[in-house]
Amino acid sequence: MKKILLLIMTLIVSMTTFAQSDIVSVADAIKIFQTKTLYTGQQVLEKQGYIYKGISTDSYGKDHNWVKNMNLTKDFVPTAFAKGNSSMVQLDNTGKTVYVYVINRTAFAGLQAQVRAMGYDMGKAAKSSKGTLICTKDNQPTITFMTLQMPLPFCMQ
């Protein structure tokens, strides 16, 4: 019985690890945020298989966009999802914000586990809404996890 339980736990851990392996790590997202440069974003993300898709503009400003296992329409709406975990990384043109959007709930939970392992306080802020988790750590950037709507249901900011 113990062997069966051990086998099941091993399978769960390996599936969770696989679910996260093709998404940018939290440490890399923080590195991009701290350097605040397009060059660092390109170096880190393109080495991991992300493809640069250009600059999108909305009411909040301009963002540089990279995608993995998916494509974007000319309006930067996600389309053509491929095998594996689809994700999109946006770097605000001013370098003040990095967004990581994922489609898979397991990959989203994996990002949260990485933040927890880095020693962040995983508490909710007093004014946070349902589906928003604000994580803090001294002398480190604040990380926010948000549950949104399709086509990009999960976001780490």
Segments and roles (model prediction):
Residues 1-24:
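Bacterial Sec-dependent N-terminal signal peptides
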Residues 20-86:
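N-terminal leader/targeting segments
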Residues 56-61, 71-72, 91-95, 124-130, ...:
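Short, ordered beta-strand-loop transition motifs
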Residues 76-130:
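Long, charged/polar, surface-exposed segments that mediate recognition or autoinhibition
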Residues 110-157:
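A charged, solvent-exposed segment within the mature domains of Sec-exported extracytoplasmic proteins
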